[in-house]
Structures are given as structure tokens and as C-alpha cells.
Amino acid sequence: MLKKKIIYKISSLKKLSKDSKFIFHNVKNNFDGFIIKRFDMSVATFYRAIIGELIKDIDKIIYLDGDTLTYGDLTEMYNLDMTDLYFRGIREYRPNMKYTNVTRYICAGVMLMNLNLIRKNKVFEKFKEYYFYYANKGIYGNVIIVS
């Protein structure tokens, strides 16, 4: 749970842009009993798999990792056609990925997500299955599962 001081600091950013909006969710740990066997992952990594369940009134979002900086307007990215797509993202170069036949990867830290289609086709349920099965074995990271 975020401390009140941190929530206040984040909320104060609203004065930089009148169009910005901050919503804070207290998230239950839906990953109880999940053992992470990779040094470069935390349970927070897996919350992108349930974001559609947390934000039910929004159909499309831009997902950015917390360590991602943006400069400029993201409207053009947000307005990309997502009619039949779950995700749009930036291609990531991964020539030596083990244990997979996936040949095209997207960067899981910067994505446009069609939450409406994802919810309709229950894609997040499938993601959770993959996360629990593969990522818990230390084989796949978030890049593979999203790709």
C-alpha cells in the first residue's frame, strides 16, 4: 500500500497538466503462493496481467513501466487503431531467447493495450496461467508472455 505522503506527491503532479488524472487502487495480492525464481522479476511485474480487472471503465490504455520516461505527447500512440489487436508495442531484439519458438517480441514496458478486447476474450485469464506455469519456472519473462 502506498504511503499518504507518496500519494500526495504523485497527486500534486496534476497541477502540471489540467488533463491528467491519477487513480490509486489498493490491489489484493492475487499471486499468493507464487514463488518468483528469477532475480530480475518481482510480483509487481505480474500486475499487468490483471490490469483489465482493476480498471473496468476504460477500454484502452498506454501501459508504461515505472522506470520509463516520456517526452512529448502520447496522443498519436493512443490513437493507433486497435480494432482486432490486444497489444501494440515496440519490437524488442532478443536473438538468444531460450525455450521458445516465439520469433517476434515486444517490449513489455511500453504497450498500448486494448482492455475491451482483452476482457471480452478473457486474455488475462490465459496470461495468468502462463505466468504461473512458465515464469514461475524461471523460463519466461514478461516479454515472452506478452509477445
What are the language-model segments listed below?
Residues 1-147:
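Glycosyltransferase catalytic domains, chiefly GT-A lineage
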